[in-house]
Every structure is written in C-alpha cells, then in structure tokens.
Amino acid sequence: MNELRFSRRTLLAGIPLSAAAAPRTVMVRAKRKPSDPSWTEYPTRTVESLDGFKPRQTAADRYGGRLDRKARATGFFYPIERDRRWWLVDPEGHLFIKAGVCSTSPGRSKNNKEALARKFGTVERWAAETVKLLRSHAFNGTGGWSDVASLRQAPARLPYTVSMNFLSTFGRELKLTFQQPGHTGYRGDAIPVFHSAFPAFCETYAAKMVDAPRDPFLLGYFSDNELPAPRDWLDKHLNLDPSDEATLPSRRAAENWLSARKGAKAGLADVNDEDRDAFRGFVYERYLTLTTGALRKADPNHLCLGPRLHGSALRSPAVFRAAGKYLDVIAVNIYGQWSPAADMLEMWRAEAKRPFLVTEFYAKGHDSGFPNTTGAGWLVPTQKDRALFYQNFVLGCLESKLCVGWHWFKYMDNDPEDLTTDPSNRDSNKGMVRIDYTPYQDLLDGMKELNANLYALTDWMDRG
C-alpha cells in the first residue's frame, strides 16, 4: 500500500469535490473478478488521508440521528433535502444517515447452527450480542434479509428494513420464475406487471405482509430484489412467444405501447435506443405505481424503497424518472465500481430528484482462505484492504450529497458446505464475521473509523 497524490480529476474521475476534499490516496490492489490474471491498483481515499479533516464523534439519539441537527419529528423516518444535501430524519426529528449491514441473521447451515449454540446458546442471545457488535463499530442499522423477528426482540434495537417479494411471489404462482445468481429470473425477462391479476395480488400481498405499521425503528420496505431491466427489453417483449399465456400480457403491452408511440404499423425494425429506454421506464412505472400504491395503503408510515435497482437499470434515465416519481428513497445495489461513478450519480440527480440508499456493495479478502469464486464484489488481498475499499466507496457516496445511507453485504461469510443457498452465495468472504461468528477485526476497525466520524465527515464536505 503506497501513498500517492493525485489531482482532483484523477481521484474521482469527474465527481465534483467540495473545497474541503483532499487529493491524497493510498493504492489498493484489487480484482473485479477472481479469474482476472493479475491485480490492478486503484487510488483509494481513506479517512486518514483527508487533508484537514479532524475526527470528531457526534452525539446521537437512540436511532443514530445526530442530536445537533433538528427537523420536524413525525415518529417515523422520512427524507429531507437541506442545504443541498439529502438526509433521513429519524422518528425523534434528528438528521440521520444510515450505516447498515445486510443479512444480519444467524447462519442456516449445520456448521452455523453448531457455532451459534457454542458461542451464544440461543438466538435471543445472538441477537443481543450482534446489536452490541454493530453498535460498538458505529453501525446504526441492518439491511435486507436480516432476522427481523429476532432483532425486534433484542434489548437494544437498530433501525431496519423489510424485504418483500411482490413480483417473485406472483411470478412463481404463474410458473414464470427460476433461480439466477443473486436474484430471481423470469422467463423471457418478462416481469408480469401487465398480467390482469397483478393489481389485486399487490393489494392482498401488501396487506398480508405488513406486520409493524407503527414501529418507529422500521425504515421502510424493499418491494423486490434486482428485477431485470436489460437495454433490449422492448425487443425481448416483442419477441415473446405469443402462445405462452403467462407472458402474452407482456407482449401485448409492448405492442400496444409501440403502436401508441410510433404508429399502428410500427415493428421491431422501427425501434431505436431512445424507444428502448422509454419502454424500460414504462414497465417500471407500471410496477412502481402498483407496488407503492399497495404498500402505502397497508402502511402509510414507512418508506417505499423500491426493488433494489442494479446492473443496467442504474444507467437508465427512464427507470430513474419512474423511480423518482414513486419512491421515497431509491435503493441501489452497486457492483463493479471502486467509487460510485460521477456521470451515473449526476444522471440520478437530474432524472430522479430523490436520494439513494446503497443496499449492496462489498469486497472479498483473499487472505480469508475462501475460493471467492461466487458473488459480484471485488477481490482484495487482505481484510485491511476490505476496510479501505469500504472507506473509499462510502466517502464517494457521502460526497454526492444524494446518499442517505448504505448497507454492506453482508454480516456473515458463505459456508462452502451449504449448497442450499443461491448460487451467488456459496464460497466467498463477504461477511464481517466468519461462519463461526468470529469477527474480522481488521475489517471492523476500519469500518468503525469511518462510521464513528460519519456526521463530522458530512460537515467537513459541506463547508465552504
């Protein structure tokens, strides 16, 4: 790890920097894929490298909101833009940015269960000790797929989210779905939002799944995970099998949309890239109006966070226009970016005009002894390098002034012996604890260095 100095342009590839930002970095070796033949060095900013920044902890309330910045209290979380920076406001009315962890749950494998019994004895004790672990490293929340039921009963609580599965559940009923690495796949990439039964399903599903509409610690809901939005989605819809009754509503919706846009005789040969992106927005608008409408009817108090946009959807202006229209905060899973890309963030700002919450990002450590062949996160040599990646990525998020939080993926490593998991979670060092619940202390120490200075860093970035 070597310390170097770079110009502001080199540092963030065009991300606008505040006057306070420092042009100092360290170099961290990484691979985007474990199969890459060699390591590449990436300029990496850390808390320690920020010229002029002085670490300072800020007093916080029980939710993690800063006591020195106040807004209107509603008893629940909500977003607010103040002085050109987006924040969450916690139930007591204090400005809040969420530092959370995905999949904060006991492991389900035989090895995990035996380790939990040895270390904690009971799931209740695990929940209490895990909240202590997170809080002691300045995390103030949990993310998707966490053990909500157990963590709700812990003596001390953390803000949390709830993961729902509107489309994957409905699609499964239609026999349209299959497992892909990391998320549900749909036949022909056609999500069945145009099916005549989907609106009623959304209403019933939301009413059934909402179980804590008055809980102030609940931040909000993810409606699904990583829905498809390929650039050629319109082409795929127009080519769907007309004899397939489950996907026929999607094909007809695409045909009708194209006819309304370009004339009754328009076909695939008349489609251009502007049409393709507009169609993505059309599909997402249909999905979002139904799911957010059903959620807000069942629970008007908590935030709609959306389906955790990922992949090519992150570059779609039309998808982000639709997301900004219907979501309170836009959940995004970001992979393949050492820092959040400047042009992408500016597009989100222009099109959505809403804040974002990073709901997955991570790096795996080569020193863990895992093969690390599964999952989309970066590969770095050591646990200390994982912490440096965390600091660099989060600093880029904070500097955007659009980010109201992040969820590291994830709490626990994959157990290579557990073959019941989804194929993207088989053999990799994604956790902050090992499969026997032993913490990766070098990683956690580096995370704490940033988390503990979270509000001081935003103040430093916003000055001048």
Residue positions per predicted region:
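N-terminal secretory signal peptides and thylakoid transit peptides that target proteins
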Residues: 2-17
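Active-site-adjacent substrate/metal-binding segments within catalytic domains
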Residues: 37-156, 169-214, 274-282
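Polysaccharide-binding and catalytic clefts of secreted carbohydrate-active enzymes
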Residues: 83, 91, 185-193, 204, ...
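Loop/turn elements at helix/coil->beta-strand transitions in domains of secreted/extracellular proteins
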Residues: 94, 137-141, 156-159, 214-220, ...
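Aromatic- and acidic-residue-enriched segments that line the glycan-binding/catalytic groove
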Residues: 154-181, 223-264, 418-430
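Glycoside hydrolase catalytic-domain groove-lining segments
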Residues: 282-289, 301-307, 311-375
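Substrate-binding cleft of secreted/luminal carbohydrate-active enzymes
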Residues: 378-423
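Aromatic-rich peripheral "rim/lid" segments of glycoside hydrolase catalytic domains that contact
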Residues: 409-464
